[in-house]
Amino acid sequence: MTAPRATVVVCCFNGAGELPKVLEALATQTLHDQLEVLVVDDGSSDGTADVARAHGVRVIVHERNAGLAAARNTGWRSANAPVVVFTDDDCRPAPDWLERLLPAIESDPGVIGAGGAVLGVDADSLTRRYLQANNPLLPLESDLLESDGLAHRLWLYVRRSVAPQQPTGARDVSSVVGANMAFRVETLKLAEGFDERFHFGGEEEDLCRRLVLSGAGRLRFVPEALVIHEFEPSLRDTLRRSKAYGRGNARMYLKHSDLSPTVYPLPLLVVAALAAAAFLRRPRWAVAALLMPQLLFAHWPAKAVVRRRPEWLVYPYLQLLQEGCSDVGFAGMMLTGRDQFAAGEEA
């Protein structure tokens, strides 16, 4: 039997409702007959494994929930192909997804991993429209690795907040997005895979950082390799994810001692200004604090006027809430996770 060209791993935890859609999308891939599809059921209690088996794909079941990083490790270690590709159960790959993604790895021995674009589903709620306009699932650009210093990261934050212009076209990046990424299996073996202490949030960034800084090779972004992500339409879920990403940022900082912390300054400034206004009884300070998001994220009100979309005037505050929840997650992990990432300890 001919070995598959790639193994597609879908990790699930109680994903029975969403899983059929992604499996159907994988069944319509232009390269379908060259693929192995593997579902890793990470301790679900809703019949996820039975749903996967009904679609005729390989299934591996964790008896207990071990986290996304552990599920991904199970997936690539069980792959029968030289390349392993990851997507999620709430994603819908385009029919030519892998036809466009795989050549980035296969045609260049210096490329050890590749990722494609992850876009939000058609906007039918305020939250989804915001996430479509302010996509949280973008690759980390290569300029992030130019320096680990705090000043460099602060400059990147201000620059991207004021004028968030994203590069276009295929290019090298410092990290790809977990919902749309592919690696050589041999490369993952050398790196010992994902660090399972990350559980969820930051695990792919940690892996990519280790790979790139080790000199193993380059990571390539292929924007035409498209996956649609069905974001949960509620603001509550968006903020929950932001908090989880903040915990991942803290794990990155605890593990990589040379890395500056990823903390968003604007929520801290707004809270400090509001506290000072209340303490000193300066109501004008409170007004100024509430206008800070409109000034720093000035592209939102500008676009609201130019494009006649008044709803976008709310977006600076949604972004403020996201960044604030990320900071809360960061602080919580810094308080509780130090023992887990003791100095010199490896995964």
Q: Where are the regions a protein language model picked out?
A:
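Short, well-formed alpha-helical segments that are part of the catalytic scaffolds
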Residues: N14-T28
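A conserved acidic beta->alpha catalytic loop
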Residues: A25, H32, D41-A49, R64, ...
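Conserved donor nucleotide-binding strand/loop of the catalytic core
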Residues: A49-S78
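Short aromatic/hydrophobic "clamp" motif used to bind/position activated sugar donors
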Residues: V84
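Conserved donor NDP-sugar-binding/catalytic core segment of glycosyltransferases
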Residues: D96-D143
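Short, flexible, basic/aromatic active-site loop/helix in glycosyltransferases
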Residues: N134-V173
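A short, conserved alpha-helix in the catalytic core of glycosyltransferases
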Residues: S174-F183, T187-E192, R197-A225
